Amino acid sequence: QQLEDIFRGKITNWKQVGGDDRKIVVYSRETSSGTYEFFKESVLKNKNYMSSSLSMPATGAIIQSVSQTRGAIGYVGLAYLSPRVKSISVSYDGKHYAPPSMESATDKSYPIVRPLYYYYNKENSEQVAPLVNFILSPAGQEIIKKSGYIPVK
């Protein structure tokens, strides 16, 4: 609930959630981003972001902006977690908090997780099959894991 309230502008100062007396600066992705849509659906429950949120064109821009702005908050995908910014633990129920990690995403204790899919034209299935087979192979799954994504196998 607190994340929703921050990103919707109901909570505007960190002291409202037990932090320092500092204005919260909200960074989000641009509206064409799948991450923007997912966060809006899952965290904001399809309600609008606060009008003063600062829209960033890429994940790297969010990390850079949050790392350089006191009181800032933003969101990035698990594969893009950076030591330049502090990640926060999140809870389904306000009692049991989980940090963003491969383990918490896999065991579903971290509540903000979405699947990613590959889509291709059926007419190209013969040409795409070797790529799909490689992605699903142990070597492909290892590359996915090393890239910070959760393998399907």
Predicted regions and their residues:
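Exported/periplasmic ABC-transporter solute-binding proteins
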Residues: 1-153
